Amino acid sequence: IDFSKVPHRAPTYPDTHTWLNIWGVWDTGWYLNIAQNWYNNILNSHGGANYGFFPLYPFLMRILGFIVGNNFISGLLISNLAFLFGAYVLHKLVSHQSGSETADRAVLFMFLFPTAFIFSAVFSESLFVLCMISAFYFANRNRWFLAGLFGGLVALTRSVGVFISLPLLLLYLQNRTFNLHKIRADILCLAFVPLGLGMFCL
């Protein structure tokens, strides 16, 4: 596979739908390539390889692509649905901590900040945000299995995702009033985060 030929702008069907093509630029070609061909060690003309992109997003693109018949369209659906669900979970999280009025503003700012359009493109950002907010949402409710599970999905979405393990661990210890005698076996659920990274490295 010659990655130098991966399109800067991702083609869709039919070609006349340029209003869809604008949502497929920059890294979209890499995600489409992984969704179609998975990972390999072939470098493009600039020395780049597709294993620099983490697998959860293109994996979901491939799965949904079997249903809708087009990986690019599936990427658009995943990104926009993840964005909407992420906003919903953000509202629940902030509402629980600071009230519904603050939650309304948080979601409004999420939709209106200048680069929010990225969440609608064929990039992994919206999926990353959904999984990250979900991890904190469940951590705040002391549901550590789900918090760790979504933390693991964060680590499978982007390279920086593994660092969510630090605030999750802090929240866990805070919930236990930083008393080591109160630590229970559920702390092991946080191991899903490095496990997610380890699965990709294998």
Predicted segments with their positions:
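Short hydrophobic/aromatic helix or loop-helix immediately within or flanking a transmembrane segment
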Residues: 22-41, 46-69
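Transmembrane helix irregularities
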Residues: 67, 97-98, 112, 116, ...
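Transmembrane-helix signature of polytopic, membrane-embedded enzymes
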Residues: 70-74, 90-112
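Specific aromatic-rich, kink-prone transmembrane helix
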Residues: 89-92, 109-112, 118, 127-146, ...
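Membrane-lumen/periplasm interface segments of specific transmembrane helices
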Residues: 1-5, 23, 153-154, 161-202
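Juxtamembrane/transmembrane-helix boundary motifs at the membrane-water interface
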Residues: 1-19, 42-46, 66-70
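Membrane-embedded glycan-lipid processing machinery
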Residues: 46-53, 64, 74-81, 109, ...
